[in-house]
Each structure stands twice: as structure tokens, then as C-alpha cells.
Amino acid sequence: MYTEFYGILVLLIFSVVLSAIISGASYILGDKQPDREKVSAYECGFDPFGTPGRPFSIRFFLIGILFLIFDLEISFLFPWCVVCNQVFPFGYWTMIVFLAVLTLGLVYEWLKGGLEWE
């Protein structure tokens, strides 16, 4: 069947099991007594300067999300460039459609003013 993917499957299963073990151990062994220090906001080791939960600019959040989207796009482009000549017709047009959708999304965001920093 797909024997070349067994290594990835084993790695995936190992990662999930190890994550579950570590999370379970943290939950079981962790201290569950909340006090003032545990429920207060953490600001780089200093006492909080203001009230916790101050709102931040939603623009900052949107720019961060856009950065993550286009950062993931680059992570898809690098492996595609390596095997482009092996998957030429289908892989090429698939990536062109992928890039076109992302470009249309960027143009839409630009026209709606999502990239303006005020």
C-alpha cells in the first residue's frame, strides 16, 4: 500500500502520544491552588502597570494574521519549487490557482483598507 508513509505515520502517532502524556502529567501533577500571583497578568516579570485585559488594536491582530497566511504560503512554495519539474502540468496549475487565490485575497484586503495602519 503506502509503505513510504509509514515513517510519517509513526512520527505522528509518537507526537500525539507524547503530547498527551506530557499534558496529562502536567494536569495531574500541577498545583491547582490559584492565588493572586497566578491569576494576575504576566508582564515580563514586572508587576502589572495597568489593569489586566486592556484592549489592543484589532489592526495589529489582522496584520499578524496576514503575516501568518503569507508565511505559510512561502512554506508551501519552497517544496513545490523543488519538485516542480516532476509534477509539471497538475502541480503547476494547482500552485498557480493557489497563488491567484492568495493574490485576490491580498488585493481585497488592500482595497478594504485592512493594510492601513492608523
UniProtKB/Swiss-Prot annotation:
GO cellular component labels: mitochondrial membrane; NADH dehydrogenase complex
Membrane-spanning intervals of the chain: 5-25, 60-80, 87-107
Domain of life: Eukaryota
Main location: mitochondrion
Membrane topology note: Multi-pass membrane protein
InterPro entries: NAD(P)H_OxRDtase_bac/plastid (IPR023043), NADH_UbQ/plastoQ_OxRdtase_su3 (IPR000440), NDAH_ubi_oxred_su3_sf (IPR038430)
GO MF annotations, alphabetized: NADH dehydrogenase (ubiquinone) activity
Gene3D superfamilies reported for this sequence: NADH:ubiquinone/plastoquinone oxidoreductase, chain 3
Family: Belongs to the complex I subunit 3 family.
Name of the protein this chain belongs to: NADH-ubiquinone oxidoreductase chain 3
Organism of origin: Metridium senile
Upper classification of the organism: Eukaryota, Metazoa, Cnidaria, Anthozoa, Hexacorallia
